[in-house]
Amino acid sequence: MNYALETNDKEIFDLIHEELDRQNTHLEMIASENFTFPAVMEAMGSVLTNKYAEGYPYKRYYGGCEFVDRVEEIAIERAKKLFGCGFANVQPHAGSQANVAVYNALLKPYDKILGMDLSHGGHLTHGAKVSVTGQTYQSFFYGVELDGYINYDKVEEIAKIVKPQMIVCGFSAYARELDFKRFREIADSVGALLLGDVAHVAGLIVAGEYPNPFPHCHIVTTTTHKTLRGPRGGMILTNDEEIAKKIDKAVFPGMQGGPLMHVIAAKAVGFGENLKPEWKEYAKQVKANAKVLAKVLMARGYTLVSGGTDNHLILVSLLDKEFSGKDADRALGEAGITVNKNTVPGETRSPFVTSGVRIGSAALTARGMREKEFEFIATKIADVLDDVNNAAKHAEIKKEIAEFAKGFPVYTKAIF
């Protein structure tokens, strides 16, 4: 058997190395992306990928699970310690699957969900009509006010009209802190369960740099990458034993078969990193760097939804500009800066064009960049957007960015 990727499949090997070069020479500023730890990638590339383990630790449907049982047990214990909760399911393959599993466990088809409007910063799985969640359940939405903040009195007003079975508090593009306590008061007032989707800010929560959804949320879901810097995957947490039992059944056998044991091992490794004292410093720096981005871009005349940030991301509104989010995304890409176009409150363009861009600080902070570097980066972003159709200028800035990025290498090899 030929074990070497380079000789076994040169085409894929070369593409992986081209991606390594892109990650090293470009500035990754998509808010949902990050650079995971080499040890996490080692675990993902391990022999655990060969093991089927349907079921849960010590309650499997296959034999030979004595070692993967312990692996999953460690992942669960570390997850509970990180969030200070009683139960954790680490098997969901992704955050979206974690959310769907929660709905399947606790709701009936056509029950009512109240979540954040996608164009105001919510997520597809919070009831958007294009998502299975918006097709299986009756979905209703709250949003932000003209100042870019959630108006909790308005959320309560909507909840009392809708009377949902579940309220979802979470986001994919909201730069401010969520008031989980207030959300719980609203949920209790209408007899609803409260789901906290903290996929974007989980890494800040476990460092004490963002409010903890517990004890306010009945259920919490998150991804394990993004600000946690673990492998791509999902997780469901709760303090309620009866809810935990329903969640476990909804994940397996309800939605998934065999768990990805190599990824669960990688989750455990990532959680181990999150538990280290230095994690708190990383999370603090993520927030500090995002504030620099906000300050510089606003000083250069760009409008930020909510006028700043409390977390790892900023949302730039281009409603007052002649160019779109798609134009900005393309122009910054030409300059070696990767962001994503994003809808904004008051959106006038289609989701494929948009009137905003979402920019995050987590990945570049993982490369060791601090306030000084982020001031330089924010200046370059503004330079590009000030001349959004000048491809020649973007090419020059790309050279500057590539030279700058050399000082902060991501990885020295592509395969672990």
Swiss-Prot record:
Q: Identify which top EC class this enzyme belongs to.
A: transferase
PROSITE patterns, alphabetized: SHMT
One of this protein's GO BP terms?
Answer: glycine biosynthetic process from serine
InterPro entries in the cross-refs: PyrdxlP-dep_Trfase, PyrdxlP-dep_Trfase_major, PyrdxlP-dep_Trfase_small, Ser_HO-MeTrfase, Ser_HO-MeTrfase-like, Ser_HO-MeTrfase_PLP_BS, SHMT-like_dom
Q: Which GO terms describe its molecular function?
A: glycine hydroxymethyltransferase activity; pyridoxal phosphate binding
Assigned keywords, A-Z: Amino-acid biosynthesis, Cytoplasm, One-carbon metabolism, Pyridoxal phosphate, Transferase
List of residues that carry N6-(pyridoxal phosphate)lysine: K226
Annotated residues that bind (6S)-5,6,7,8-tetrahydrofolate are located at L118, G122, H123, L124, E242, S350, P351, F352
Could you say which cofactors this protein requires?
A: pyridoxal 5'-phosphate
Q: What subcellular compartments does it reside in? A: Cytoplasm
Gene3D superfamilies the UniProt entry points to: Aspartate Aminotransferase, domain 1 (3.90.1150.10), Type I PLP-dependent aspartate aminotransferase-like (Major domain) (3.40.640.10)
GO CC annotation? cytosol
Q: Where is this site: Plays an important role in substrate specificity?
A: H225
List its EC numbers.
2.1.2.1
> To which pathway does this protein belong?
One-carbon metabolism; tetrahydrofolate interconversion; Amino-acid biosynthesis; glycine biosynthesis; glycine from L-serine: step 1/1
Question: Which transformation does this protein catalyse, written as a reaction?
Answer: (6R)-5,10-methylene-5,6,7,8-tetrahydrofolate + glycine + H2O = (6S)-5,6,7,8-tetrahydrofolate + L-serine
Spell out the Pfam families in the cross-references: SHMT
How this chain assembles, per its entry, is:
Homodimer.
Role description: Catalyzes the reversible interconversion of serine and glycine with tetrahydrofolate (THF) serving as the one-carbon carrier. This reaction serves as the major source of one-carbon groups required for the biosynthesis of purines, thymidylate, methionine, and other important biomolecules. Also exhibits THF-independent aldolase activity toward beta-hydroxyamino acids, producing glycine and aldehydes, via a retro-aldol mechanism.
| Family affiliation | Belongs to the SHMT family.
Please identify the protein, giving its name as recorded.
Answer: Serine hydroxymethyltransferase
Organism name: Wolinella succinogenes (strain ATCC 29543 / DSM 1740 / CCUG 13145 / JCM 31913 / LMG 7466 / NCTC 11488 / FDC 602W)
Q: What is the lineage of its organism?
A: Bacteria, Pseudomonadati, Campylobacterota, Epsilonproteobacteria, Campylobacterales
